[in-house]
């Protein structure tokens, strides 16, 4: 029977795991590229407070050692103590399970609704930005606005723990910073990278702005842009625009 011996007096469970994250590289082959799934995992690991390394992968010229490590796999993926994991949803579940309290933060939302808030936005945005028919533009824009409005309403609606049943004050609007409260959760790691893409690309290729009246969304984005976990894992606006230069269709009659 093999025994797992403690190293340097550390028990097995006390050792820091060896984690490497591989993300899509930008157009220069080195910087962070446009990939909401890469940013999602990058944010999760950062928020967990675990030590990890990040490598950008140039999809135009995959290095041979990467082909050997994860043949046929596109980033993002991770190696966790040398074990390769490639499915983003399963990686999220795995990290939440193994990087757990008391040593690491729990990132699952307390309110199930936070997981699904804004889930339709990216699909509506994709249909809007890929459309080339002027006569369809207005209806597709309305569809996008409707999903944004739904998210805005969720962000402005007080969560149960914002309401004090013993208080005489009637709280009509939420003041929370993120989807599930004042701290980021897995739900934010999923939605924020996509919402940022929508903001940047729709402005560049459709001159569309998220309406200022959507105060919940703007409060949400402003709070996200004040956090290193988001801004330091985010591709530059130029990278996002480059990524969509062939995807965004011109409206032609």
Curated annotation (Swiss-Prot):
Subunit structure of this chain's protein: Monomer. Interacts with HRH3.
Any one GO cellular component localisation term in the record: mitochondrion
CDD domains hit by this protein: GST_C_CLIC4, GST_N_CLIC
Post-translational modification N-acetylalanine, affected residues: 2
Enzyme Commission number, as recorded: 1.8.-.-
Protein name in the entry: Chloride intracellular channel protein 4
Lineage: Eukaryota, Metazoa, Chordata, Craniata, Vertebrata
Species the sequence originates in: Pongo abelii
Role description: In the soluble state, catalyzes glutaredoxin-like thiol disulfide exchange reactions with reduced glutathione as electron donor. Can insert into membranes and form voltage-dependent multi-ion conductive channels. Membrane insertion seems to be redox-regulated and may occur only under oxidizing conditions. Has alternate cellular functions like a potential role in angiogenesis or in maintaining apical-basolateral membrane polarity during mitosis and cytokinesis. Could also promote endothelial cell proliferation and regulate endothelial morphogenesis (tubulogenesis).
């Amino acid at each position: 029977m093999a025994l797992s011996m403690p190293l340097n007096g550390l028990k097995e469970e006390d050792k820091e795991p060896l984690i490497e994250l591989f993300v899509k590289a930008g157009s220069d082959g080195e910087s962070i590229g446009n990939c909401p799934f890469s940013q999602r995992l990058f944010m999760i690991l950062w928020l967990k407070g675990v030590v990890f390394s990040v490598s950008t992968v140039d999809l135009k010229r995959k290095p041979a050692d990467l082909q050997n490590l994860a043949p046929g796999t596109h980033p993002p993926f991770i190696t966790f103590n040398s074990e390769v994991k490639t499915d983003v949803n399963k990686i999220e579940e795995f990290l939440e399970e193994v990087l757990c309290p008391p040593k690491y933060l729990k990132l699952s939302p307390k309110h199930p609704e936070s997981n699904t808030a804004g889930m339709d936005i990216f699909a509506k945005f994709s249909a809007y930005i890929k459309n080339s028919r002027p006569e369809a533009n207005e209806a597709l824009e309305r569809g996008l606005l409707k999903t944004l409005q739904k998210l805005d309403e969720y962000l402005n609606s007080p969560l149960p723990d914002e309401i004090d049943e013993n208080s005489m004050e009637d709280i009509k609007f939420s003041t929370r910073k993120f989807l599930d409260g004042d701290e980021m959760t897995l739900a934010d790691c999923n939605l924020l990278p996509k919402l940022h893409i929508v903001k940047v690309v729709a402005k560049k290729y459709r001159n569309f702005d998220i309406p200022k009246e959507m105060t919940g969304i703007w409060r949400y984005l402003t709070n996200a842009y004040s956090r290193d976990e988001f801004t330091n894992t985010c591709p530059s606006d130029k990278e996002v625009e480059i990524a969509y230069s062939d995807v965004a269709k011109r409206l032609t009659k």
